[in-house]
Amino acid sequence: ASVSKDFIGKDASVLARAAGLDVKPDTQLLFAETDAKHPFVEEEQMMPFLPIVRVRSVEEGIERSLEAEHEYRHTSIIHSHDVENMTAMARALDTTLFIKNGPCMAGLGLGGEGYLSYSIATPTGEGVTNPKTFTRVRRCVMVDNLRIY
């Protein structure tokens, strides 16, 4: 099985309808529990669906994340209040974009730290770029924590 390209860029209600569900047209995100080898975990989706994989510990969660990331070193995300867990995941996955407590788009400057940018992330390029240099800059983003005001 694989993720259907027909659903790339479609809104959540289109995906829900295809799954036999009826949701409000303004639904922004679908989520469901699945196993670690499901295509929604293994493949890039580019659609509003969040697969949830149940694990017994943060260590197992990091291990499963590492497997799903396939050593592309592109993007990883964690939601946690424990900075040590965030640090352990950052070190294990070593991705160009690492977002803590926010959506993946925060790593590109949408709702997170830094300027709006595009990612030419590994393995296809050099990560977050800017118009002046178009070279790789590593960004580490944390949302809603460590505020100084």
What are these regions (language model features)?
Residues A1, D11-A18, T34-K37:
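Glycine-rich, charged/polar anion/phosphate-binding loops
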Residues A1-S13, E42-M47:
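Flexible, acidic loop-helix segments that line cofactor/substrate-binding pockets
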Residues G20-Y149:
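Conserved C-terminal structural/oligomerization subdomain of aldehyde/semialdehyde dehydrogenase
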